């Protein structure tokens, strides 16, 4: 039978079926791996051979068979499946396993319009040969299967209509480096390209989706996050909508500040008409956000911000829930509700909160961000002024409505605007921060546009990347990595294009970066400490202190070479004020760890040279790019040892790093008794991080009486986060049991119930709904 059947190769030629060839490829993929079996994969794939079967179909069946065998007991199948998938991918891209010469590849891709022509203008064929010398294509074999699927789905340059792929991962990494360092002097740039290539291809620095998929192509917009503030005029609202459309079409996630829009029934033109209120304009923004899919990489998404004291707040808080009718709901945006000290004080004193339309209370909206004492003075004054339209509501009722909607939708976020402005690299009197972004980790100044080309408006962009904490052996490692990350991202600001002048001006003036971390849960497990019991507090304090210190040092060094950013005078750094001076002192009760770095020397250097970047750090979610590095997501605890990720590119399994050695050290999300320990760690990180943190709150109703989380508990966590200086809260996760997919391997472990529930979990990839401000 073996003789009669033939296979159809990729080039269309037919040859006799050779089972030995298939066996050799599978055996090659299993080499050196622990507890995997080539014959097991062959049995599992039970290929139905027929005459003329495509070799491509055989290959895909084998890959799927290996991927299906990934489990806690045999995590190495994720590497076996990955090797088979890499083999397949290279055959698709190059027609063979061996990658071509880099210079030939770049030339061909530029001719086909898939790479940016500047690559050939900036580098000679000899220089590409030099890069070829240090490219290590065997690093492809360090990817897990989940990583290869992400590369294929999101990152590699391809034709998204036909599905053809044109490159493999090492070319991606080296060409990103070549693009970012192209303008460096010829005598130093090759060394930077090599160092940056090594850092990214060895997963020490993790890059965000827009950079991985876009740098080297002709589309030049790589800022993950865009923050746009609207004014209260129709012109400004229209300008905001057009800016949203421009940025959504170019892979960015959007934060919209709509807090200035006046309330329903406000007079227009001295009462000639009355205002339709916020909801029709929110709907307009929602339509703008959903108008484009982000370069085929993900669907558009936005978070919209407004203050808790807005007159329409009771109608705004329910916009996302599934009750109500189409007219009074705007469900496809996420929302960020803004709080400050006075709001919490009214709650604690069981007092009332008074709601106003921002248009009726001159100066109040601006003071809400820029000056807390002035806000309180005006607020009380307006409360007593009988001529002003207002509504009083018990603080506990309003907070309870907020928490109820946050809990039921999971996607109503919170920003403490006083912490955001008091503990900030910007001087709030000249550059207040009035909003955050899609995922709540960015805090940058914005100004409304009056028309889309308004040079006086300010749209904030943030360019992201992250350090993989799993690769940090000593805190001095941050020195080299911070230097590379800051240099590369700073170059990117000059390299990219800006569809809106207000974004170009803001970026050139402030040069804001947001560098975060991935693999935090693995870092804790590796050091034998936990989220829940305070054992990690000292380590986290030392780690984030070192990270911020070396990032600032890198930015000072860059300022020596290239000059400080033009609006450096609007930062608190220019006044000699550091994050270590302005953090919330209540934190000292949680962590008394002394400072380890030489902050005085850094302060002196900043005074002398300034800094190249107004901001340097932000802790973002990293669902996608942490899969590339086979790391845990951002600062989050894993939900299970094996996660099954579902996205538009299919379903993949990923096992937590070093599972076999560290399984007893990992603390899984639903085994953590409360939010207290996690919030304390977030507070410690926030002491050093100059922007903010995508911090989540998690609740398991099964731990409470009658299976319901008491409102008292929700409000306690809210107040505790405020007390620790937490600036923002992102998702509210509720354990519903549905994500704890009991799998057959979990059944074997049922004698240990907690572990059984933790065995495999399904994690929805909400990257399609957003994820632009993730990395």
PLM region descriptions:
Residues 157, 164, 171-189, 193, ...:
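Function-dense linear segments that define catalytic or interfacial modules
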Residues 1-3, 13, 36-174, 178, ...:
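Core nucleic-acid recognition elements
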